[in-house]
Swiss-Prot record:
GO BP annotations listed: defense response to fungus; killing of cells of another organism
Similarity field: Belongs to the DEFL family.
Signal sequence coordinates: 1-27
Location of this chain's protein in the cell: Secreted
Protein name: Putative defensin-like protein 165
Disulfide bond is among the record's keywords: yes
Record GO cellular component, one term: extracellular region
Length: 84
């Protein structure tokens, strides 16, 4: 009986500690910046440039939509700094 009671108590403590931490966490904001506007995007170069400049992930996106022209867009973390 006492082992079962102790197990329930520990479960309650863990649950309570998780619930108190959850409101303190903040999702990091993601931003997008167009790199080399007007130039045709080459994916390998775009990813390298984005990582070097903003520590982000580069992607070629159609601009304007429906055309055959692509521009380099860099997606990176721009929100408040994390704890890690």
């Amino acid at each position: 009986m006492s082992t079962k009671l102790f197990s329930y108590f520990m479960l309650l403590v863990v649950l309570f500690s998780v619930l108190t931490i959850i409101p303190k966490t903040e999702a990091q904001k993601r931003c997008r910046q167009e790199l080399e506007p007007g130039k045709q995007c080459v994916l390998a170069k775009c990813r390298e440039l984005c990582f070097k400049q903003l520590k982000g992930f580069g992607s070629c996106i159609e601009k304007p939509p429906g055309s055959s022209k692509y521009t380099c867009n860099c997606f990176y973390n721009c929100g408040p700094p994390g704890f890690f």
